[in-house]
Swiss-Prot record:
The keyword Cell inner membrane does not apply. The lineage of its organism: Bacteria, Pseudomonadati, Pseudomonadota, Gammaproteobacteria, Vibrionales. NCBIfam families: DapF. This is Diaminopimelate epimerase. Catalyzes the stereoinversion of LL-2,6-diaminopimelate (L,L-DAP) to meso-diaminopimelate (meso-DAP), a precursor of L-lysine and an essential component of the bacterial peptidoglycan. Pathway: Amino-acid biosynthesis; L-lysine biosynthesis via DAP pathway; DL-2,6-diaminopimelate from LL-2,6-diaminopimelate: step 1/1. GO terms for molecular function: diaminopimelate epimerase activity. It comes from Aliivibrio salmonicida (strain LFI1238) (Vibrio salmonicida (strain LFI1238)).
Amino acid sequence: MHFHFSKMHGLGNDFMVVDCLTQNIFFSPDLIRRLADRNRGIGFDQLLVVEAPYDPETDFHYRIFNSDGTEVEQCGNGARCFARFVRMKGLTNRTTILVSTKKGKMSLKVEDDDQITVNMGEPQFEPNKIPFKATQAEKTYLLRAEDKTLFCGAVSMGNPHCVTVVDDVDNYDVDKYGPLVEGHERFPERVNAGFMEIVSPSEIKLRVYERGAGETQACGSGACAAVAVGIMQELLEEDVKVSLPGGDLRIVWQGPGKPLFMTGPATHVYDGQLSI
C-alpha cells in the first residue's frame, strides 16, 4: 500500500506529518523506526498523525511518535506544524484549532504573520504529575549524574522535563549529560533534558536532549519548560526569547495558575508519497 505525507519542521525540529482522516495506516514501532532512518527512510525527529477527534468539543486528535517508535504525550514544535498542516491540506479553515492529545487538550492559533501561538496549558510542578520521584515539589532538586551534581528544575508541559541552568550552553557536554538525565532513575517514564543559559531576565539560550530522539535543533515544550522553571526560580521575567540551535521562540507565562503560551514558525518542506 502507499500513503501521502508532508515533511515539515519547526526551527529544524523535523517531522513527517500524515493525515489519517483520509488514509488508513497503522504505524507500528518497527515501521516508525524504518521511516525515521535518515539514511534508508525519510528521516525525522517525530512522526505526527492527524486523526478524527476523540472528543466532540475538539477539531482533531494529535498523536506524536518519537523516532524510536514510542508514542509521547506532547510536542510543542509539532503542534505548530500540525496547525499549519491541517489548514494547508484544507482539513479546516479555522484560525483557532482545538486538538486533543494523549494527555489533554491544546489550542493552536494561526497569527496574521503566519506564526503559530500554542496554548500549552498550565505547567505542572507536582512530582506525581511529571512523574518524578520526590516527596514534595521544590523549585530546585539535586540530581547526581556520574561525576556531576546537577541543580535542576522538574516540570510537566504535558510531557516530562528536567531543566538545568549552565554557564556556557554552547560548550556544555549535552552528549554526555543528556542521556544520563533522560534515563535517570528518578524519572520513571524517562525525561526530556534541557540545559539553559541565562542571557538576561528576558532571554535564554537552550539545548534539549529529547526523550527517545536525542538532541534536536529545537524543542518547543522544552523551551516552555525552561522558561517555567526559570520563572519559578526567580531568574526570568514573564515574556522570554528562547534561542535554540534552530532559531528563536517567544514564551509568555504569567505564573502559577495561568496557561503558558509559545509562539514560533512552522515550515513546510515538501509533500511525498511512500509505498510500504
